[in-house]
Every structure is written in structure tokens, then in C-alpha cells.
A protein has these predicted regions:
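A metal-dependent, Asp-based hydrolase signature
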Residues: 8-10, 19-55
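Active-site neighborhood of HAD-like aspartate-dependent phosphohydrolases
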Residues: 1-14
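A generic structural signal for short
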Residues: 21, 61-62, 83-84, 115, ...
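Helix N-cap/coil-helix junction residues
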Residues: 7, 42-43, 104, 136
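Asp-based, Mg2+/Mn2+-dependent phosphohydrolase catalytic module
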Residues: 71, 75-78, 87-197
């Protein structure tokens, strides 16, 4: 809508500039569209900013869905007595918004964010805080995530094991896991967690 209403770029160009801004400022920054209009027009255009924000939120809401088998896996884990937590590098309100929109918030006993802790995954501190909040023993705790460095290595460095789901793990990462004999299991589908735990 921004392009259709006066942003003098085609959609691919606008998206490219926006991606650069997001890379520079981070995904939690709240004024990506403000900067986009400043960069392209030389000044902030409130109407175009509003169009960008509304379009982004409408698309996000329309596309936000749990992966297949996520709900079944959460039900299974809770039925087996597991306490579940979220460790996220997203700001707190955004993480809660995701959990509420996905209707999975009630499965989680704790939500720990980098905003609250002052450290981001893979920093050991965020895992230590999560373990402390959940009264967890690292040797009996498992991080389930999709990012090798942030989720799996961070968890292993905190003394936990990890399960990587649907991850773009490189051959180099796999070789490192084998060489270091890291307690990291790689699976393709979240539903496979039920066969491991």
C-alpha cells in the first residue's frame, strides 16, 4: 500500500530498503517504516508510515499459525508432566502477543525474554535465568528450538541438552556437533519430539 500511495519505489525496491533497515535496527525496533519514508522521501510521511504498519500487522496476523503438530506436541509434553517455558530474543509484549495469537500461551509456565534479562540467546545468562525461574536442573532440561547457535549451542553451554526442529543446520554445524559430542538432536518435524521424550 505504501507504493500504491506515493512511495516512489517499486515493491521489490521498497522491500529491499526495509530489509536493510531491519538488519541495521533489529526486528524489535518500532520505527522501521518511519525510517523508510525518511530515507526514500527525505522526511517522515505519517500516512505512509501508518499504511506500512497496518499492512505489516494485517499480514502478520493472517500468516501467524503454529507449525503442524505443534498443539499436539504441547499437549503431549504437558500430559507427560513437563514444565514448559519460552526463551525469546523478542521484546516481552511481542512474545506474549505471538503466544496469545497462536492460542498456545496457556501451555507455558514461564516466558523469559532478552528484554527482561538484559541478555540475548545464546548468552548463558538468559538460560540460567530461565532455569532459575523454572526451578530447573540443567541436566534434566531440554531446549527445543530451530536455530543452531542461538537455541542449541546456547542451551548446551548452559548445561542443557537441545532438540533442533526444522533447522537449517549446515554440514559444518553437524560436524561440530559430532566432533564435540554435543547433546543436540536434530529432527525435521515438531511432532517427532513425542518419539524422543
Amino acid at each position: 500500500l505504501m507504493v500504491d500511495n506515493g512511495l516512489p519505489l517499486d515493491k521489490d525496491e521498497a522491500y529491499g530498503v526495509l530489509k536493510t533497515i531491519i538488519r541495521q535496527k533489529g526486528s524489535n525496533y518500532g520505527k522501521h517504516f518511519n525510517i523508510l519514508t525518511e530515507v526514500v522521501l527525505g522526511h517522515e510521511d505519517p500516512m505512509l508510515v501508518a499504511l506500512g504498519m497496518i499492512t505489516y500487522h494485517n499480514v502478520k496476523i493472517a500468516l501467524l499459525r503454529p507449525f503442524a503438530e505443534t498443539i499436539d506436541t504441547l499437549i503431549y509434553l504437558k500430559s507427560q508432566g513437563y514444565r514448559l517455558g519460552v526463551i525469546s530474543n523478542v521484546i516481552t509484549i511481542k512474545q506474549w502477543e505471538k503466544l496469545v495469537r497462536l492460542n498456545v500461551y496457556s501451555f507455558f509456565d514461564e516466558v523469559i525474554t532478552s528484554e527482561e534479562v538484559g541478555a540475548k540467546k545464546p548468552d548463558k545468562l538468559i538460560y540460567d535465568v530461565a532455569l532459575r525461574k523454572m526451578n530447573g536442573d540443567p541436566e534434566k532440561s531440554i531446549m527445543i528450538g530451530n536455530k543452531f547457535k542461538e537455541d542449541a549451542l546456547g542451551a548446551v553451554n548452559a548445561g542443557m541438552s537441545a532438540i533442533l526442529v526444522n533447522s537449517d543446520v549446515t554440514e559444518e554445524d553437524r560436524a561440530y556437533i559430532r566432533k564435540e559430542q554435543l547433546d543436540i538432536t536434530i529432527i525435521e518435524n515438531i511432532g517427532d519430539v513425542n518419539t524422543i521424550l
